Amino acid sequence: MKTYVIGDIHGCLTSLKTVLENTPITAQDRLIFVGDYVDRGPDSKGVIDYLLQVQQEYSCEFLMGNHEEKFLLSRVYDFEIKEWYGFWDAQATMDSYGTDDIEQIPESHWEFLRKLCLFIEDERFIYVHATLEPDVELQRQQSHTLIHQKLKDPQPHCSGKIVICGHTAQKNHLPLDKGHTLCIDTDAGRDGWVTCLCTNTGTYWQANEQAEYRQGVISSLSREHNQCETVSNET
């Protein structure tokens, strides 16, 4: 089983479909999505519809991004929906639903949004949307840090695990590799790319809204993978 982590999507359905269809994912593999499925891009509704379909075919886990949090809050508070429209590119999302009435959004989409996680952890990695406070245990992290805080000068987390996140757009459209921290927000929704990273090998795949497709390697994960293979072959 391999783990594939998908970065920020922002309504870019063509990018998402292209990257997943060209990545060698099998039914035994695990998919983790780091959040920001909606806003900016042309088809937020289509993205959520597609994710609901994908989770029927694969083992999927979904993190909450700041855009999903704002989406949920906008259903409850008038001031939140005004801010969502004013600063968060909500119009693109509502246009994809073909309505300006938030209550017309399918209940299955609200259920999907309500079930999103704040963090995911396994033996080697911690997955969050935004970032972590380096000296704070995972269970004690503030939700604002996990969902909203920008990645400025990331430091190793006290757990010793590698942190994989999105949220802070990489304007060169390539994943950020700090060794202890990997950011795979490659600016989807602003003429960037959706990134899918295999944590087992360090290989990543990217696609954009023109259905262009490319791949690369995160060197820190690739070195670790090669070292593990060498040890395995020696034994």
List the predicted regions and their residue ranges.
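His/acidic metal-ligating clusters that form di-metal
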Residues: 105-133, 138-173
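Active-site neighborhood of divalent metal-dependent phosphoester bond hydrolases
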Residues: 40-48, 52-118, 149
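Active-site environment of divalent metal-dependent phosphoester hydrolases
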Residues: 10-14, 39-42, 69-72, 134-135, ...
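Beta-strand-turn-beta hairpins that frame and shape the catalytic cleft
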Residues: 1-4, 120-126, 178
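N-terminal active-site segment of His-dependent metallophosphoesterases
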Residues: 1-48
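Residue-level marker for buried hydrophobic side chains located in beta-strands
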Residues: 5, 31-33, 62-63, 126, ...
